[in-house]
Design a protein with these regions (language model features):
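Class I SAM-dependent methyltransferase core
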Residues: 62
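Conserved SAM-binding strand-loop segment of SAM-dependent methyltransferases
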Residues: 103-113
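C-terminal substrate-binding/active-site "lid" region of AdoMet-derived donor-dependent transferases
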Residues: 134-173
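Conserved SAM-binding loop
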Residues: 94-95
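Conserved SAM-binding loop of SAM-dependent methyltransferases across substrates and taxa
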Residues: 67-77
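S-adenosyl-L-methionine
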Residues: 1-54
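Conserved SAM-binding motif I beta-strand of class I
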Residues: 80-85
Length: 173
């Protein structure tokens, strides 16, 4: 098990459903599950390659950046990436990832995405999550004229590859 995998396991075991995690989510008005959809370099690289033609040379705002791996890979294609993450439970891993490989064109912002409206603007806003899909889409549209629901696109292209709950989240949007 890699160092990051071990850290993720510790976060899942300690924080998911804890009183402090639930209180934080309520206090900040976020709906964040302690489940990452991009948790390794392979997944992040594949998603970034999928998005590359639409983000090349552009400013990207990633909503719900988790531990920041996708943002790092997006930075290989985009001119600038702003990664916004509201859930502090990922902060230990986030710091580890940043210390190892953060490039200058990728910035990380900690807080609910709506806190940065009017401050951060992009050409493209993306979200790659199963948490609060509808809310993520609504806030993403306020950051950029082009919004990409990464898993929405992937599920639409190959619905049989995803479980019923992932498909149902997109049917409600």
């Amino acid at each position: 098990m890699t160092e990051i995998s071990q850290m993720l396991e510790q976060v899942y075991n300690t924080m998911e459903g804890s009183d402090s995690s639930l209180a934080y989510s309520e206090r900040h008005g976020i709906e964040a599950a302690a489940v990452l959809t991009v948790f390794d370099d392979e997944t992040a690289g594949l998603v970034a390659e999928h998005l590359a033609p639409r983000i090349a040379g552009k400013t990207v705002v990633e909503i719900g950046g988790g531990i920041g791996l996708l943002a790092l890979h997006l930075g290989l294609h985009a001119k600038r990436v702003y990664c916004i993450e509201a859930n502090p439970m990922w902060s230990w891993i986030f710091a580890t990832v940043l210390l190892q490989s953060k490039p200058k064109n990728v910035s990380f912002l900690f807080g609910a995405a709506d806190e940065f409206l009017g401050t951060v603007k992009g050409d493209v806003a993306i979200y790659c999550t199963h948490s609060d899909v509808k809310g993520m889409g609504l806030v993403a549209a306020q950051f950029a004229p082009l919004v990409i629901d990464v898993y929405g696109e992937l599920i639409k292209a190959a619905p049989e590859s995803f479980d019923q709950s992932a498909r149902a989240l997109r049917e409600l949007v």
